[in-house]
């Protein structure tokens, strides 16, 4: 029998405490920086974030564990053999163009019932909410003795996921689990993620620099070229800044999540659209041709390179996330979100064919691949969580597929479940979590943790 839905009336005091804990965690600039020789494998800030949340978890009365090598940590309620896992991450993407934030990205503020700050939505806020959901289960004695609940904190989700992979080697996969790092209602399929660099011959005297990570839409580009100040007339007011001393032009775009490139304003593409008009003599250049053939029409499916890459999980999408200038070359970094039914070998083959036709001096440098993830819509885990979500909102929604990548792809019997309907806010300037969504999320996670204990009883 399905358990009755719990409508939790959180006190104003506890809600304020929860928001404060989110804000304190978001103050820590935990951008993951992997090092094999560092005392802190993902940087001291990631370690500080882990220490903060483990201390909080311990104050709630949970069992806490920190990996001796500082790779990950977790907090646990109960001692049952069957573990309900909650997979959260404490690392964040860089803030991007600081001038586009209403406040410092790592000095969280509250405005109009919204918590602004890097990590508020992805994924520190959801981590704190789930800790409070566990606290409710503990305080109300709602955990069956055969179960335990373990929230696992990763420190490199935005980069190589090595932190959570290390946890898997040490402890294995939980009995069932979810990650609060996606989009409501529930994600049953995640596209393959393919990161690749393309090396192009340099255009004489043109120096370019943009982007810090490929899974983030670049919100600015810095360009140096003779008389480039004259290019400002091709942009709207407020879209450029020129440094006369250095002779560098900054073009301003708008950041966002690399899985939804259409929801930002890519500064790299913006620059090249104008540059081909400013310097038409370079239109035959391989880099200019690549950009104009694939990006200037505001489409991101790279159909010229990857024709008919589409299935039930959607179309292929591409984020041109980085560009660097080195002697003789530009290095362009791409984040491809590839439909579930396509493979890494297909991508490399089709990209190689296209590049060979365009210019044989272009080099392909594959960086990393994250495999696709799919779980059946009729799976017991999916059914319990979807029923819980739909009951909360009085809706009848179906699970969805996304281009975003979460820890769910590493684990068996795991899905991405929440915590927002506005995933495009992740990775952008002025990332925020609304109070209404925070309250709804807490309710949903409390009921999810309560009902998942009936997993073995579901048919």
Ranges and model annotations:
Residues 64-68, 240-244, 320, 399-400:
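Short beta-strand
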Residues 83-153, 159, 171, 435-440:
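Active-site metal-coordination/substrate-binding segment of hydrolases
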Residues 111-113, 133-150, 278-286, 394-396, ...:
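Phosphate-handling active-site elements
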Residues 1-85, 92-96, 331-333, 348, ...:
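N-terminal helical capping/dimerization or prosegment-like subdomains
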Residues 10, 29, 247-250, 326, ...:
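Zn-dependent metallopeptidase/amidohydrolase metal-coordination segment
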Residues 14-17, 21-28, 52-60, 136, ...:
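Generic non-transmembrane alpha-helical segments
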